[in-house]
């Protein structure tokens, strides 16, 4: 299970540091969204993954939140048609050191996600994709935890 406290602490630390240094923050906090009847505080990391902090576990100051992002709800709306991915237990190492975890769709298509993006979600979770498999949704039994964007790998690199 994701450590909601650690993720929030990392985000606050990064946002505060960015205000001091003037550099762009890696994290963005958005106002609450409701997905499948549950209320979450979306926490976007580098624009390539989103952590959904259940409102009941949120310790984030609403002053840090940007105006709600309707895209978050829209993106998770397409998760309703998502199919479960199978973890192949395979890690592909790219020349630049990035480790990609490989999943398989029910149709045999390989889907790769940067290991660094999904590691904070913890163990014992389920992965889903829909359509063209560009987005990998991450879910516990009852609640969505977030998403990460898939990494495209050329056929000759597989």
Where are these regions (language model features)?
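DNA polymerase processivity clamps
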Residues: 1-158
């Amino acid at each position: 299970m994701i450590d909601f406290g650690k993720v929030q602490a990392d985000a606050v630390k990064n946002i505060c540091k960015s205000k001091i240094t003037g550099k762009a923050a890696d994290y963005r906090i958005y106002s609450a969204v409701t997905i499948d009847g549950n209320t979450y505080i979306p926490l976007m990391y580098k624009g390539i993954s989103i952590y959904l902090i259940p409102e009941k576990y949120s310790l984030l100051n609403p002053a840090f939140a940007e105006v709600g992002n309707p895209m978050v709800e829209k993106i998770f709306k397409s998760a309703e048609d998502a199919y479960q991915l199978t973890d192949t237990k395979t890690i592909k190492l790219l020349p630049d050191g990035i480790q990609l975890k490989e999943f398989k769709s029910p149709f045999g298509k390989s889907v790769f996600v940067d290991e660094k993006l999904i590691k904070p979600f913890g163990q014992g979770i389920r992965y889903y994709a829909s359509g063209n498999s560009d987005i990998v949704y991450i879910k516990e039994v009852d609640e969505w935890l977030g998403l990460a964007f898939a990494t495209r790998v050329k056929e000759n690199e597989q």
